[in-house]
Amino acid sequence: MSRIGKRPVTVPSGVTATVEGQTVKMKGPKGELRFVVHDDVEVKLEDGAVKVAPRYETKRAQALYGTARAQVANLVAGVTKGFEKKLEIIGVGYRAALQGKSLQLALGYSHDVNYAVPEGITIAVPKPTEITITGNDAQRVGQVAAEIRGYRPPEPYKGKGVKYADETIFRKEGKKK
């Protein structure tokens, strides 16, 4: 049994939650989100809280309902506070610039990398070596951050590349003569 799944997700004031079949919809100040819960998981809206329970006593249902509860909690957090990821660019000549709906990255290649900003995601570049990604969907914010980091992941010798702000790079020592 999942210990996380047992706890109901409270819906704060200012957020409206609806459950239609297996679809959970949340509407709040930061927008509207929906999540389709797996068929092995039962979802109910009771007393201003969303309750998640396994529909069957199978191992799969037990595994899925804790995940479903966490996803519903992310919906509530997304429509109230939103999510944010910060990236840092380290390296000589490495920089980022925002041009309209496109993020232009100079990452040491012979060409600049242009990344089209998806709908529902806001990208800010406070400094040429910092990128801030915000949005109300945790999965999409994380995916965009991972895609941008994937263009030039940090290398272990000098630490050059795009890294998460809270990430520590495991450094290696160079060859010895």
From Swiss-Prot:
GO BP term (any one): cytoplasmic translation
Record keyword Repeat present: no
Listed GO CC annotations: cytosolic large ribosomal subunit
Name of a matching Pfam family: Ribosomal_L6
InterPro entries xref list: Ribosomal_uL6-like, Ribosomal_uL6-like_a/b-dom_sf, Ribosomal_uL6_a/b-dom, Ribosomal_uL6_bac-type, Ribosomal_uL6_CS
Gene Ontology MF terms: rRNA binding; structural constituent of ribosome
Alphabetical UniProt keywords: Ribonucleoprotein, Ribosomal protein, RNA-binding, rRNA-binding
Record function comment: This protein binds to the 23S rRNA, and is important in its secondary structure. It is located near the subunit interface in the base of the L7/L12 stalk, and near the tRNA binding site of the peptidyltransferase center.
Subunit details: Part of the 50S ribosomal subunit.
HAMAP family in alphabetical order: Ribosomal_uL6_B
PANTHER family tied to this protein: 60S/50S RIBOSOMAL PROTEIN L6/L9, LARGE RIBOSOMAL SUBUNIT PROTEIN UL6M
Family indicated by similarity: Belongs to the universal ribosomal protein uL6 family.
Protein name as annotated: Large ribosomal subunit protein uL6
Source lineage: Bacteria, Pseudomonadati, Pseudomonadota, Alphaproteobacteria, Hyphomicrobiales
Gene name per UniProt: rplF
